[in-house]
């Protein structure tokens, strides 16, 4: 029986793509660089903000100094506008409350910067729904490396044999599997069925309630 569910953030709990794309395109426009569609941004996110910035920055020039400056621009812009269009996916708040009522603890593990994770989760979900919220931190490898996930499970006392990881991308499925956990794909997120299936998702959720059903069957 699953007793702990660890969630990815972007594309799983929250639909953040419009605010991420707007911030990225704002930076691009400031420099006269090409901009991108929201659909294109869906395939740029997932590996952390530094990698996102690298992906939307032109290859020439792409020096470490330029990338660092662009990262600072993006981070400031996104932090100021991260709640303009972002919203929880329909059914997510209800799922979290249902899991809590059944004694299933939940936590967040994201490649988004740790301070941003805490702020955005608190804004949309308040306190009490998550045992812990952890994003990328200096010295801790990002997903799909399982090191941060191990640390999170130890922090909240999660039994690895009774823990499920849920996310919307191949990175999330790999993260769960690298940590020895079953990994469930969220079909409402940024990537879709083909990528999640190819990554070896143990199950797929078409709607958030499917996560609860999966746990009940387990």
Where in this protein do the model-derived segments appear?
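Active-site neighborhood of HAD-like aspartate-dependent phosphohydrolases
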Residues: 1-43
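Helix-loop "lid/cap" segments that line or gate small-molecule binding pockets
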Residues: 27-28, 48-63, 120, 152-153
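Metal-dependent phosphoesterase signature
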Residues: 31, 55-94
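Short, acidic loop-to-helix structural element flanking the phosphoryl-transfer center
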Residues: 80-108, 114-118, 146
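Substrate-recognition "cap/lid" segment bordering the active-site pocket of phosphatases
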Residues: 84-87, 113-166, 170-179, 193-195
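Short, glycine/polar-rich helix-capping loops at beta-to-alpha or helix-loop-helix junctions
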Residues: 188-198
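Short acidic-hydrophobic, aromatic-tinged amphipathic segments that line or gate anion-handling sites
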Residues: 203-207
